[in-house]
Amino acid sequence: MPNGLAARLRRETATLHRQAERAGVMRHLLAGRVDRTAYVRLLRALYPVYVELERSLSQHPAAAPASHADLARAPALAADLGHLHGPGWERELLAVPAGVAYAARILAVAIERPPLLAAHAYVRYLGDLSGGQSLGRLVARGLSLAGEAGMAFYHFPAVADVAQCKRAFRAGLDALPFSADEADLVVDEARVAFTANIRVFEAVAC
């Protein structure tokens, strides 16, 4: 059984990962039932999460398993919200408390234990590169979207080969210089991140 950090994260968060896929709005999206209002609210909830994650990783690049600039999602989320809601989305759409709390957790990690940002990068970015690609196709079909308009969140223009990027991301996790105790903390923080995602998905249930 592989014992690298990437394998540990996958193995030891598997139960929470499955729970997240069945939680709130995500359960409906993965079943192909896409409610536009709920989906826009999901993007609104995730926006501050990515803003904080990307700001924190830019300040602590050693915590990033891969180039976070290539994977940054905040600008894509802003573009999708502008397309799906309108240019006044940031003013007109209320922030989702569960998303604000998730972002606050990332900020606290950045201040108190920056290396643990790797856990949040793992949960969000590797998810976006993996199941997120299938989710994007379901959303596009459900909302009758064509091309990248409203779908920027699922497109990675700086990534030429998604499969290779995922392999490099996992290798980057394994190369981070964590002690055994620190690796345990990263796994624990990934569980926190999955729990935060579950709360977001439940908060924007259809």
Predicted stretch roles:
Residues M1-C206:
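Metal- and O2-centered redox machinery and metal/ROS homeostasis
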